[in-house]
Design a protein with these regions (language model features):
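Residues forming the flavin
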Residues: 1-171
């Protein structure tokens, strides 16, 4: 809703219709480290956010390719995209906090969002499945101020209606 409404308002009225969620003057926290999260970082900065923090549950990727990740495989490296670059230019630091998730949203006496409680995460092996998973680090909870929280996580993929309309088989 945040990105779509901002784009529609920008195209329809150069943001003069106020038909979007404004980040102006707000302490913005974005949950999600992917492309949509990056777009939320950049858009929040252009709105005039007081601060922008981006939470990523996974560890920071390495700065250079590992030997087991050769070309032409997709590079599994840390990517600093335009939104993070804008945050560095405006606020003087990378907005990302890695291996962190939200445990609780905090509200003031009027019921308005005023912050959240985060917790650090670490990789652990699930004893039942043998798979690696992220688990909370006990005692690592921290409070963070926030006036606006944007959830930018869980991309499910594209819609199939165009492929279906043309009889294209997907795999």
């Amino acid at each position: 809703d945040f990105l779509k409404a901002t784009t529609k308002s920008l195209l329809d009225s150069d943001l003069k219709d106020n038909q979007y969620i404004s980040a102006k003057g707000k302490r913005v926290v974005i949950i999600g480290g992917g492309d949509t999260g990056n777009d939320c970082v950049g858009t929040s900065i252009r709105h005039g956010a007081a601060s922008v923090t981006q939470l990523e549950m996974m560890p920071k990727a390495p700065d250079t390719r590992a030997e087991n990740n050769p070309w032409p495989e997709w590079p599994k490296v840390c990517k600093t995209d335009y939104g993070q670059e804008e945050a560095i230019a405006v606020f003087g630091h990378d907005p990302r906090i890695y291996q962190t998730t939200v445990k609780e949203f905090l509200k003031d006496k009027n019921g308005n969002l005023c912050g959240l409680v985060t917790v650090k995460l670490e990789s652990k092996k699930d004893e039942k499945t043998g798979r690696m998973m992220m688990a909370e680090v006990p005692g690592s909870e921290q409070k963070m101020d926030a006036d606006l929280v944007l959830i930018a996580a869980g991309f499910l993929g594209t819609e199939n209606y165009i492929a279906n309309a043309f009889g294209v088989d997907l795999n």
